[in-house]
């Protein structure tokens, strides 16, 4: 998988999500390539451009987070601090867009635990992104109220 190349995803309603290249590089650095590597998690930060979303930044694992091989709990206060800083630096254009975490599988797919957690914890009138970083690929979904829809990666 190449790094520093942006990823573009599209859903059935032609909504586009662009993940900037430098963000892709950081996400790839957390892949669970070794059998002892724990899951990682953070938040997605970026811009809403009409129905389209651009992921410009992320928060990364840190103090307070609980990380195990097949479980992660994003508890660190630094995640919200990162969103607040991005919002201030961008004069209000960079916002919380959703969540990301890793899975120890090549082609990730949401677990029942993932879906339950998203339904319980992500409550918003805005659509929120749900990204899973696998060893060889990504899974991207969007939660709108109770509905989760899946994006397809556009190959470049």
UniProtKB/Swiss-Prot annotation:
Sorted UniProt keywords: Antiviral defense, Hydrolase, Metal-binding, Metalloprotease, Protease, Zinc
Enzyme class, spelled out: hydrolase
Regulation: Cleavage of conjugated proteins is inhibited by EDTA.
Residues of the MPN domain: 16-156
Entry's induction text: Part of a CBASS operon consisting of capV-dncV-cap2-cap3.
Active site (UniProt): 39
Enzyme Commission designation: 3.4.-.-
Short motif (JAMM motif): ranges: 101-114
GO terms under biological process: defense response to virus; proteolysis
Binding site for Zn(2+): 101, 103, 114
A single GO molecular function term of this UniProt record: metallopeptidase activity
Deletion consequences: Not essential for CBASS function; when the operon missing this gene is introduced in E.coli it still protects against phages T2, T4, T5 and T6. Another paper shows the operon confers protection against phages P1, T2, T5 and T6 but not T4 or lambda.
Record flagged with keyword Repressor: no
Function: Metalloprotease priming reversal component of a CBASS system. CBASS (cyclic oligonucleotide-based antiphage signaling system) provides immunity against bacteriophages. The CD-NTase protein (DncV) synthesizes cyclic nucleotides in response to infection; these serve as specific second messenger signals. The signals activate a diverse range of effectors, leading to bacterial cell death and thus abortive phage infection. A type II-A(GA) CBASS system. Reverses the primed state of DncV, the CD-NTase. Cleaves a DncV-GFP (green fluorescent protein) fusion protein precisely at the C-terminus of DncV. Overexpression decreases the efficacy of CBASS protection against phages T2, T4, T5 and T6, blocks formation of DncV-conjugates in vivo, and inhibits in vivo activation of DncV. Antagonism of phage defense upon overexpression is CBASS-system specific, Cap3 from this bacteria only antagonizes its cognate CBASS system and not that of C.freundii, E.coli or E.hormaechei.
Similarity field: Belongs to the peptidase M67B family. Cap3 isopeptidase subfamily.
Entry protein name: CD-NTase/cGAS isopeptidase
């Amino acid at each position: 998988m190449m790094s520093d190349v942006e990823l573009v995803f599209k859903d059935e309603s032609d909504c586009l999500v662009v993940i900037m290249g430098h963000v892709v590089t950081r996400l790839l650095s957390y892949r669970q390539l070794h059998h002892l590597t724990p899951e990682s998690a953070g938040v997605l930060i970026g811009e809403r451009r009409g129905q389209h979303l651009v992921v410009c930044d992320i928060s990364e694992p840190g103090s307070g987070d609980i990380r195990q091989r097949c479980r992660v709990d994003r508890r660190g206060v630094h995640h919200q601090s990162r969103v607040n800083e991005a919002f201030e630096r961008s004069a209000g254009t960079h916002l919380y867009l959703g969540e990301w975490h890793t899975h120890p599988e090549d082609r990730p797919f949401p677990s029942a635990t993932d879906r339950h957690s998203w339904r319980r914890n992500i409550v918003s009138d805005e659509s929120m992104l749900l990204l899973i970083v696998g060893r060889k690929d990504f899974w991207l979904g969007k939660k709108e109220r109770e509905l989760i829809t899946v994006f397809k990666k556009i190959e470049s």
